[in-house]
């Protein structure tokens, strides 16, 4: 099984209830597509290094998952691309222990 780290930034002007629902939805997408969620961290609101879509800050979320294939991360990326609430995301495959 491979371990992935998924980081995504939610736009800062989202309401708290909508942000909670969005985070649950996207973390749930990873779980329903066969990935095991190892940990999920909410880093809170942080300043961006540069503006993204005229936003100077955003809510950072980091999720570590373990999966046999990349189906879960592919589905996450597909839905994150079309979501207006996620302003940036990144999926990284962690190195396997040797």
Curated annotation (Swiss-Prot):
Bridged cysteine pairs (disulfide): none
PANTHER family: MITOCHONDRIAL 28S RIBOSOMAL PROTEIN S6, SMALL RIBOSOMAL SUBUNIT PROTEIN BS6M
Family recorded in the similarity comment: Belongs to the bacterial ribosomal protein bS6 family.
InterPro entries assigned to the protein according to its UniProt record, in alphabetical order: Ribosomal_bS6 (IPR000529), Ribosomal_bS6_CS (IPR020815), Ribosomal_bS6_sf (IPR035980), Ribosomal_S6_plastid/chlpt (IPR020814), Transl_elong_EF1B/ribsomal_bS6 (IPR014717)
Function description: Binds together with bS18 to 16S ribosomal RNA.
Keyword set, alphabetical order: Ribonucleoprotein, Ribosomal protein, RNA-binding, rRNA-binding
Species assigned in the record: Staphylococcus aureus (strain NCTC 8325 / PS 47)
Span of the signal peptide: none
Protein's name according to its UniProt entry: Small ribosomal subunit protein bS6
Lineage, highest ranks first: Bacteria, Bacillati, Bacillota, Bacilli, Bacillales
NCBIfam families: S6
MF-aspect GO terms: small ribosomal subunit rRNA binding; structural constituent of ribosome
Gene Ontology cellular component list: cytoplasm; ribonucleoprotein complex; ribosome
Gene encoding the protein: rpsF
């Amino acid at each position: 099984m491979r371990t992935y780290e998924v980081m995504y930034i939610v736009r800062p002007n989202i309401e708290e209830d909508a942000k909670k629902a969005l985070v649950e939805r996207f973390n749930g997408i990873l779980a329903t597509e066969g990935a095991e969620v190892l940990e999920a961290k909410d880093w809170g609101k942080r300043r961006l290094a540069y503006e993204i879509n005229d936003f100077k800050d955003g809510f950072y979320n980091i999720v570590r998952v373990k999966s046999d294939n990349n189906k879960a991360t592919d589905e996450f990326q597909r839905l994150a691309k079309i979501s207006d609430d996620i302003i940036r995301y990144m999926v990284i495959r962690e190195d396997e222990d040797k």
